[in-house]
Amino acid sequence: MQKLTAATVFAELQGKEIALIGLGVSHRPVAKLLAQKGMKVTIYDKKSPEELGEAAKELTAMGVAFVTGADYLQKLRGDVIFRTPGMYFNHPRLKELMKAGAAVTSELELFMQCCPCPIIGVTGSDGKTTTTSLIAEMLRQSGKTVHLGGNIGRALFLSLIHIS
């Protein structure tokens, strides 16, 4: 399978209605980047913009819309939907939207499709941050260029502009 590029992905997203489920660590910078590129972005979250704090204020000022409240998933719509890492593709609402023609993806999925270099992933219940940090440092010490990201605090998709 041929790798996509970030530029190709952004070109394909132009003119689409983009929905991001949740305003978590990975979606904040993605929403900001997409808004900066002039895309129509809506965040769907259970929490109100006030509860979401400064990130919501900044994104609102950039033209990002918010749909919030207990029924946010029932209101969910879009041409391209970025699911939160904790929401599986087989969620009933996502299945409905896919059946209606929506593309459902995630920040991590797009990163995996576009990343031009080897990827090391760490999963599990306990110790992921420590293990990931140790692996990254060992690779750095051996002379490798390392791009550390994920739930460690940096959205991986945004790092694609620095990876070759």
Predicted regions and their residues:
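N-terminal leader/targeting and accessory segments in enzymes
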Residues: 1-106, 110
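Phosphate-binding loop of NTP-binding sites
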Residues: 74-76, 85-164
